[in-house]
Amino acid sequence: MNTIIMIPVATAIVSLLVGTVTGYAIRKHSWEQKAQNAQNDADHILADAKAQVAAAEAEVNAQKQAAIAVKQSAENTKKEKILEAQEQIRDYRQKTEDELNSKKDNLARQENRLQQREDTLDHKNSLLDEREAGLTEKEDQLKQQNASLKAKLDEADELVGIRRQKLYDVAKLDKDQAKKIVLDQLSDELVKERAEMIRNSNEEVMAKADRYANQVIIDAIQSSAADTVAETTVSVVDLPNEEMKGRIIGREGRNIRSFEALTGIDLIIDDTPKVVTLSGFDPIRREIAKRAMERLIKDGRIHPARIEEMVDKARKEVNDDIYEAGESALMELGIHRMNPELVKTLGRLKYHTSYGQNVLSHSIEVGKLAGTMAAELGLDEKLAVRAGLLHDIGKAIDHDIEGSHVEIGVELTRKYHEPDVVVNAIAAHHGDVPKLSFIAELVVAADTISSARPGARSESLENYIRRLTDLEKIAKSYQGVKQAYAIQAGREVRVMVEPDEISDDRTVILARDIRNQVEKELDYPGNIKITVIREKRVVAIAK
């Protein structure tokens, strides 16, 4: 019975234990599940928090970078503005200094000219004083001679009276016979005295003759006159046929525009059969244009690139001819040992005219005349030839350098160490400075003989060339201008600018400034068109 009772109790106890264990296991699993869920939730919350923190940090960093970029941009802009302002200040300061230096140079040149004129006047005054002193001395000598003659005449009259009385007393001659004897004796004495005076005068004249002979001869030569044939400002190129005119013009006239821009010469195509005309005041440019056009016509391929190639070849060929012309002039006159740069400058005179007269031919002629006269006068013939040849050397580059051709010639010859006599002859051949040697006088005389022949020179042509030269100088005086050409007989100026220095907007201002300066400084008939050309060329080569 007890056993029977114990079994249910044991069963109940076991069931209770099993239930307790099972419940504990279930409850433990539930607790672990909740803990795991709580841990997962905590991890998710922590991850979200970290993500939000990272996003916030990224946003803060982005804002910092943006702030830094804005600050850097502001600093760069500030630096650029400062640099731009400094550059403008430097440009303005440089421009102001250049203007001041230019004005100082002009004032210095004017002062030099005034000083030279003052020296010339002083020299002339001293010469006049010397002549006046000489005349005063001669006047005193004449007075002394007159007094001496009067005294001698009085003495002669006294002697005549004494001798007449003696003749009356001794010879008992009548008055007429006595008078004849006395006059004969007196005549012989006067003849001797006059011969002595003439002999003394001749000796005095011969003593001065050697000093004044050269000056007298030179003064006589300077009274001569002379001149040669004038040249034109156009060149004509023959065409094989009329169809060539269309090829020269090109599509919409692009070939003409390219040719004129590269050479600075007007290309005139009219109704004249089988010819085109090249017009320009600069003979060197015109010669380059003529040779380039002849090459293009012979080649047949006429387009802007080919035109540029032919113009470059013609320019090199003309430069070679210029040097050869200088050497030929030296060989013709027998001159040796001259600086090559001076020879090249001398050769440029072949393509220059003065009042229509070819300057190189004129210079050679002056050299020959000066040498011939120097040989006749016993002076240094070679030095006279050299001075005569170089007297107008400044005209070769007076279109490119400011100053008169005399000033430029003096500067050139001094730079290349020419003799002082040659430099003075150049400086004095227009009377700007005193002549310090007879050779300088001979150069003036030879220049007059060569350049003053009737009909040789043309004043209107020289004025025309000077006006076109002044137009180009005004255009080239502005910063950024690469080249300028006066064309259409001075009715148009084409100005080529550097594209990296002058913007499109600046070209408008540049054209206006050039126009204003031309209107202010030049006198001209009609209107002048100012054309500013800005061309940027980019070349890429595919290999």
From Swiss-Prot:
Signal peptide: none annotated. Residues 359-452 form the HD domain. It is a single-pass membrane protein. The keyword Repressor does not apply. Coiled coil: none annotated. InterPro entries: HD/PDEase_dom, HD_domain, HDIG_dom, KH_dom, KH_dom_type_1, KH_dom_type_1_sf, Ribonuclease_Y, RNase_Y_N. GO terms for biological process: mRNA catabolic process. It is found in: Cell membrane. One of its GO terms (cellular component) is plasma membrane. This is Ribonuclease Y. It comes from Lactobacillus acidophilus (strain ATCC 700396 / NCK56 / N2 / NCFM).
